[in-house]
């Protein structure tokens, strides 16, 4: 029995993805988790994507699933059943290896190794790339998708003016300087195979500690979902994932640090380097699948916002783009890009429903989306400057399934 449908393909990537292109889980995990884990140390039959951290490997699976509109069962034998054989080679996995090598060769020969051609370049949610332009598309209204890298144009609002407006809108520099921690509670709804609601707790401690804990108390056999960063190390534990919990060492670690720092608006000017402002644009709320929208009927969807754009680099050069509401000055979206051998991997966090909490504006609605899933979080309470147990930011306790 499948744990997902094709409409939940991206969630399926995070649920069980044990492999590119062919993989089975090894048994010696716990001791190795204290060190950076490479894909070939954890999975079997890794022929192409060797030498990359496990978190970057999982993100690579997300790129493939997104580009071809696949789920795990399209490439892995009996995926979604008790009889799954991750290590078995299939024609599609063999073909995928060849395609990864082909893309690398194209980029090396034509673009100096820069990732100008990826799976998404040609496939665009199709198994086989479209080779003939449909006339409806040619003569219809073009869909202009923004580039990852923002172009700096003279005459735009300065970075300082945008960030100063955000600081003032969030409560002002003096009040923000007094924010040392906060704890929030509410509900979260997962995507696809992670559908269903859970209780959520978010804990943050200045300057760079953050944890999101989602408790699925009504789901028998499902463990808790945890994303934690303690200022140096990051951990993820996802229900139904073949890895249980694992330590972040690749791009997701850099992203976790940025997420934690952005929890405290007063330090916005210290988070990114090589920072620049791009042209203002319009963004629209991320679409919600039925598995989420049906359980959050009071959450408005499809709203558009005119925004100012700021982009810079986080730890180890990770590319981060921030979108600020032109009217209010508040942060509406964080879009960061991780690395993989076959292209950038986007993670998007949308912020909405800002409310005053002891003089500071904080978002009560958060949508966290990545290539492997989407969490829709609605908070009902935020408490500021409260004691927080440091253990919340560290390695998760052993998996507690029900």
Set out the residue ranges of the language-model regions:
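Gly/Pro-enriched, hydrophobic low-complexity segments
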Residues: 219-220, 297, 301-400
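Mature N-terminal segment immediately following signal peptide/propeptide cleavage
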Residues: 36-77, 159-186
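N-terminal mature ectodomain segment of secretory-pathway/periplasmic proteins
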Residues: 167-242, 274-292
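N-terminal cleavable signal peptides for secretion/export
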Residues: 50, 140-201, 398-402
